[in-house]
Amino acid sequence: MNLAKKVISSELEQFEVHFREAVKSRVALLDRIMQYIVKRKGKQLRPMFVLLSARLGGTINESTYRAASLVELLHTATLVHDDVVDESMERRGFFSINALWKNKIAVLVGDYLLSKGLLLSLNNKDHEVLRILSEAVRLMSEGELLQIEKSRNLNLSEAVYFEIINGKTASLLASACAAGASTTFSDSADIETMRLFGEKVGMAFQIKDDLFDYSSKDIGKPTGNDIKEKKLTLPLIYVLNNCSPSLKKQIIYIVKNQNTQKDKVAFVIEQVEVLGGIEYATKKMFSYRDEALELLYRFPPSPIRDALEELVRYTTDREY
């Protein structure tokens, strides 16, 4: 991500100023929590996609910074709510909001972040940015609910899996790129190209996340967390659709009833590896990455395009 950060270093600093301003509150408790959130910032991938998408079309302006802030506010709100739903005590190596301030406050904090983002756009009449991101909220909610609905019977098709990750992950990255582009591009076709570009990157990003569960390099061994949570992701879906009926029955039984037993989870991970699930998912991930790059190459060569290409490659090459 070095090139990406380098070409928009001053813009990223400006974004951080805007973001800190956006989350301020006169309520002492809320302001303290907001400061905690600002301090434990992540990789800022989504704001970077907003800023670079805008730079591809022209000069970054105040509307661009507001779009980047809205995207980050929305993303942070979903993470806070996710931690409550998943009962996660940690996020990015820090205690989660619900771990420190309990569930009720965490839910309200997520609501606050979302409302601040929407008001930021509304008060500045950034109606197109607001429309783009509101669509993302709808798709993300539908994606999460579809996953809950379909995961109950552990019989997920590839098509439904892609529909789920398109909604819960890719839609936000698609909206980030479209929102950024909408602040500088005048041609709606270019904005749509950037939306599609972001969607493809988001699909590749989620498949990479799903692969970590089966082949996590950073901790030396696969975690199997998705299996423990009864989540069917692409590597396992591929194996279930291509293995013998008896093995399929055995794997489904383990995921349903023995998902806390380390040796059983290890058996499932081994089957996914041996039967080509990891290889298949990796190919799909690179296919989405290549589709994203094809869309990006519609724009003339420039340092900004190079930076976006680097970010795309980072999403599939990262080790955490």
Where are these regions (language model features)?
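All-alpha prenyltransferase/terpene-synthase fold signal
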Residues: 1-320
